């Protein structure tokens, strides 16, 4: 029991990770490595859309084809759909099973390979799947207890992180709406014309040229840019005689201006 408690503490310590670590490209490499080291297996975590969130390989089991999934950090749709249909931990799936993570073309090399898939969900929301696999040794009850704990820990983190991201998105959209509301009719026309000049989210523009084209004064454009820049929506830099370099920091401005039909 003490041995299991020690392993459990190692896994739950992942909750102490910072938000900055969760914003990494593969935020759950640490917990998959801990789990792989404790249980002696390969491990990976995918979200409900199949994006790879973290993985660690103790054993070489992938072919070049499957290795590509880990390189691109996205799993095939059919596998993801199957994983999302698993509502309780499915343990020790043989290589012949459709949800085995062992590549079809290498199953003869790993005839005793076993896959375990644990759903990651919190409050009825499906967030992803935790997948572990071994070449030839069955996952015992103690291993499965740790997997259940790990999936719960990851689920709590994912849900909290998702809520934080949702709150950030709301604050961002609110900032854009408030900034656009401060613009006059002429300034809105100017902003619409300016955004149309950009190549994606950034580009070079000449205020006097835009002003002449839409029939407003250059000062209107300058005032509009100043308001958006003070709100943190854009940043600009004078290029002297060449015009002004503009970069959009909050892309929601495109949709907000479009909604106003300017």
Curated annotation (Swiss-Prot):
GAF domain: region residues: 1-159
Gene assigned in the entry: codY
Family of this protein: Belongs to the CodY family.
DNA-binding annotation, residue ranges on this chain: 207-226
Function of the molecule: DNA-binding global transcriptional regulator which is involved in the adaptive response to starvation and acts by directly or indirectly controlling the expression of numerous genes in response to nutrient availability. During rapid exponential growth, CodY is highly active and represses genes whose products allow adaptation to nutrient depletion.
Subcellular location: Cytoplasm
Stored Pfam families: CodY, HTH_CodY
Keywords carried by this UniProt record: Cytoplasm, DNA-binding, Repressor, Transcription, Transcription regulation
Keyword set includes Repressor: yes
Main subcellular location: cytoplasm
An example Gene Ontology biological process: negative regulation of DNA-templated transcription
HAMAP family membership: HTH_type_CodY
Name of the protein in its database record: Global transcriptional regulator CodY
Residue pairs linked by disulfide bridges in the UniProt entry: none
């Amino acid at each position: 029991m003490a041995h299991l408690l020690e392993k459990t503490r190692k896994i739950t310590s992942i909750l102490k990770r910072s938000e900055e670590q969760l914003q990494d490209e593969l935020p759950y490499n640490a917990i998959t490595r801990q789990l792989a080291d404790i249980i002696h297996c390969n491990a990976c975590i995918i979200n409900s859309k199949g994006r790879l969130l973290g993985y660690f390989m103790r054993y070489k089991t992938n072919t070049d084809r499957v290795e590509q999934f880990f390189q691109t950090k996205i799993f095939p749709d059919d596998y993801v759909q199957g994983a999302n249909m698993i509502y309780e931990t499915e343990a020790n799936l043989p290589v012949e099973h459709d949800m085995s993570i062992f590549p079809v073309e290498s199953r003869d090399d790993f005839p005793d390979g076993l896959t375990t898939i644990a759903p990651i969900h919190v409050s009825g929301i499906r967030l992803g799947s935790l997948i572990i696999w071994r070449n030839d040794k069955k996952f015992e009850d103690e291993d499965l207890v740790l997997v259940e704990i790990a999936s719960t820990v990851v689920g709590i983190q994912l849900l909290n992180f998702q809520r934080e991201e949702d709150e950030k998105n709301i604050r961002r959209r609110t900032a854009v709406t408030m900034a656009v509301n401060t613009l006059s009719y002429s300034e809105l026309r100017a902003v619409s014309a300016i955004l149309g000049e950009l190549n994606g989210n950034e580009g070079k523009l000449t205020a006097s040229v835009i002003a002449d084209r839409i029939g407003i004064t250059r000062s209107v454009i300058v005032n509009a840019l100043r308001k958006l820049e003070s709100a943190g929506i854009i940043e600009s830099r004078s290029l002297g005689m060449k015009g002004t370099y503009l970069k959009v920091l909050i892309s929601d401005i495109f949709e907000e201006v479009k909604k106003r039909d300017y």
